[in-house]
Amino acid sequence: MRAQLKALARPAWPWIDQVQEVLKRLVKLLFRAWKRVNSLDIPLSPLQWILLLYIVFGFSYTAASPVFEANDELWHFGFLQHLRETGSLPIQEFDGKETVYAQHGSQPPLYYALSALLTAPLDIDDIDEYRRLNPHVRASLPNAYGNKNLIIHDASLSLLRGAGFAVLLLRLFGLALGAGTIVLVYKISEFVAPQRPTVAFVAAALTGLNPMFIFISASVSNDSLAMILNGALLLLLLRCLRDGFRPRNSLFIALLFALTSISKVTSLVLLPALLLVGSLVLYRTRDRRGAMIYFIGIVVFWMLVAAWWYLRNVQLYNEPFGMMTMANIAGPRGMTFSLVNLFSEFQQFRMSYWGLFGALNIQLSAIYYLLLDLMTLTSFAGCVFLILQLLAISDFAYARYELRHLALLLMTVFLLSIGVLYWSTLTYRSDGRILFPLIAAISPVLAVGFVEMIWWIVFSLRPPNLEFVRA
């Protein structure tokens, strides 16, 4: 017992010194690049500033988070380890035995296959030296004192070799995917509100400067891949809604939907959006040939790329999505779900969307969550107000344009909320992070509503005149 307490008393991040020089060099390179840009008198755009801050914070998170201390990183890497060692996907058993992948063995395999290819040259045979679980950890208890660490860390281990370096490499891979997601959020917001560039800036900031988004991106997680794939898919859907059917665009939509279906089950909530966009464009343009390419492409690509995994689930678990299997392994709720349960668990749910670190047991200041709650409520009120305005002036082409695009994102967010509510009825493990695969729909909606409400507040405080232009 005394030896265990001694091990737990060791610093949780002894290996930071080993990568400090590498990170210092990266920061110096960024600083020199920034000075070079200024010396050439090339100002950075708002999006570029957000990306720069995201990268700086992302490197900091990468260094500050000990190996396997990021949320579920231990089991995501366990899936990768199993795939590398056996060359096959995990088969979930209900015999009570612990596995290296836990409930995440039920996840779709695309992210883990890419990660296995990325880390193939690396030797991870020392993985067991990193995977020393803290038996006294107080996970998912942000108000608990002490025992925050999931792992007992060994000061002699290096992050620059073996499994430690594989984790570092995958974290940097996740950061790159996160940067792509921020760009896509910005582009999607430009589609939704082309006359208000402020919306795109706010949406990108709500994504790239969200501490939890940075934390998840700078960890080993399949959320990073799902976020960028879903963002690209939503952008192409909005483009199809605006421009009509284009063969290349339709085929890319079909391919992206197939890929994202095999990266995260959450992505399937985009299927109604695909069907709705195709139907609306067909009704508006009467382009039957384009519609055939669009709908047949979706079916063919999905059957070729993703169908096998869902059929495998049916054969193994008698369910296509694997959700019941995952919930049973994660820990079934074991009681009747009610609104009382929903409200009691919502506090941690909303905290874990904006920032709840480690094993969901390291929280930020209460004022931070309060301010973001106010912002979220303001955004929802602004969305309702904007929709009422657009419906009132729906005779104008621009109003119909903005209403169509906003409605597509709102429908996606609504269906995602229904899916999260269903998942919450199955297991206790429902945190705000599970919304991230569709953050490319959530952030633009929040930004549109927030900017709309702030604009009307400013408008009411400032006397209108001919020079006043809507931001």
Which residues does each PLM region occupy?
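Membrane-interface helix-loop-helix junctions at transmembrane boundaries of multi-pass membrane enzymes
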Residues: R36-S45, G244-F245, L282-I296, G382-M411
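Interfacial juxtamembrane loops and adjacent helix segments
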Residues: H82-L172, A330-R333, N361-S365
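Perimembrane helix-loop-helix junctions
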Residues: P11, R25, L29, L236-R242, ...
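Membrane-lumen/periplasm interface segments of multi-pass, membrane-embedded glycan/lipid transferases
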Residues: V314-I393
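Membrane-interface alpha helices of multi-pass inner-membrane proteins
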Residues: N249-V265, L270-L271
